Curated annotation (Swiss-Prot):
Stored Gene3D superfamilies: Ribosomal protein L39e (1.10.1620.10)
Keyword line: Ribonucleoprotein, Ribosomal protein
InterPro entries reported for this sequence: Ribosomal_eL39, Ribosomal_eL39_CS, Ribosomal_eL39_dom_sf
Keyword Acyltransferase attributed: no
Organism: Tetrahymena thermophila (strain SB210)
Family: Belongs to the eukaryotic ribosomal protein eL39 family.
Any single Gene Ontology cellular-component annotation: cytosolic large ribosomal subunit
Originating gene: RPL39
GO biological process terms held by the UniProt record: translation
Keyword Nucleotidyltransferase found: no
GO molecular function ontology, one term from the record: structural constituent of ribosome
The protein's name: Large ribosomal subunit protein eL39
Short name of any one Pfam family annotated for the protein: Ribosomal_L39
Residue ranges the record marks as coiled coil: none
UniProt cross-references to PROSITE patterns, sorted A to Z: RIBOSOMAL_L39E (PS00051)
Length: 52
């Protein structure tokens, strides 16, 4: 991908960057939740984004 990106593309990349992080520990320690990890985590080598 080149260096020139449109604003919409940058927005999408920003959103994907924010989504691609682990759960906060305080949320994991809450008593009424069964969620242990972020199942939608993405690795930059394995799964590519469908943004062109």
């Amino acid at each position: 991908m080149g260096a020139n990106k449109t604003l919409n593309m940058k927005k999408r990349f920003g959103r994907k960057i924010k989504q691609n992080r682990p759960l906060p520990n305080w949320y994991r320690y809450k008593s009424d939740t069964n969620i242990r990890y972020n199942s939608k985590r993405r690795n930059w080598r394995r799964t590519k984004l469908k943004i062109y």
